[in-house]
Amino acid sequence: MAQQETAGGVLLIAASILALIFANSYLSGFYNGVLNLPLVVAIGAFEISKPLLLWVNDGLMALFFLMVGLEVKREVLEGHLSQPSQVVLPGLAALAGVAFPAIIYASFNWQDPTALRGWAIPSATDIAFALGVFSLFGRHLPVSLKLFLLSVAIFDDIAAIVIIALFYSHELSTLSLLVAGIGIVMLFVLNRLKIRHVSPFMFVGLVVWAAVLKSGVHATLAGFVIAWFIPLKHKNIHDEPMLLSLEHALQPWVAYFILPFFAFVNAGVHLGGIGLDTLTAPVTLGIIVGLFVGKQLGIFSVCWLSIKLRIAKLPEGATWRELYGVCLLAGIGFTMSLFIGSLAFEGANSEMVASVKLGVLFGSLLSAICGALILTNSRKIK
């Protein structure tokens, strides 16, 4: 698992660098042409027509959220989030880690209603990237810190799901929502019947995803909802727990293909026309400061206060310095921040999109470098 996290993190970095190379070379025309390549799926009168970029953001990312949902369900029902005492510190930390960056972003953009739509961009944490950096530079650290980072990221993902549902959905289609609701009821029935094949769940899940896509609610939410109806303990035809089997099957696809591909199609920003105005734009600065300062400030201050008030305990075997390094890693928003940015500024002008991408790249990079330095040097200070 640690090897997969490390390799996945390296692939994310490589995909992002490749995207920047494509976007800033003679290949930029080809790159943009591929992103805007129209793809159509039609069955009778039902049709989904989207460019490749949106198939990745709406389709492949739904599989990512399916895996997140499976992980959350397992951890909440029988993992290290099943005990209330284990939930307090990461739960409070994640709440502050969402609120502080959002407030900082809003303070930079409060005079621009359009820019304010991006308030949630610096509130996200890229769980794959953060764990990848931790696996590279925190191998000597106690496992409790990794569990803390994972727990914070899980709560962060739940917050992202709620934010997307409440603030980044469009006009709703009653008929599509009804179809999605019927599909969810069918998933519940399949769960209660203890069906041992995963294929019926996936077929109904595909219908739910398509209905949610057409409903105006963001389609990625379907993946998270579907996950909660996959049986936790019922065994499949291979005599393995169905949820765990599906989670393990999805993990390499997410780590080695979905997230790197998402990074490749979303991280490419043309740097040629970018000047000081773009770098110092309120949107860019709000995201950079939100990710790099807001995340670490929110999470670490709430952890310090909770531990000093004896509401929670410092992760077992960890020092304050090591905890601070992990708090820095939570500022790696990368793919999740880019994803929320694509929702917040869908159809926006190229300057706004460039500001979002630059802010996310710089904020995430600062958090990753500083977090890695703190974690690496912590072994020398002990």
From Swiss-Prot:
Location relative to the cell: Cell inner membrane
Recorded topology in the membrane: Multi-pass membrane protein
Record-linked InterPro entries: Na/H_antiporter_dom_sf (IPR023171), NhaA (IPR004670)
Membrane-crossing segments per the record: 7-27, 28-48, 52-72, 88-108, 118-138, 147-167, 170-190, 206-226, 254-274, 285-305, 325-345, 356-376
Keyword Cell membrane: yes
A GO CC annotation given for this chain: plasma membrane
Example GO BP: regulation of pH
Keywords linked to the UniProt accession: Antiport, Cell inner membrane, Cell membrane, Ion transport, Membrane, Sodium, Sodium transport, Transmembrane, Transmembrane helix, Transport
Keyword Transmembrane: yes
Protein name (database record): Na(+)/H(+) antiporter NhaA 2
Gene that encodes the chain: nhaA2
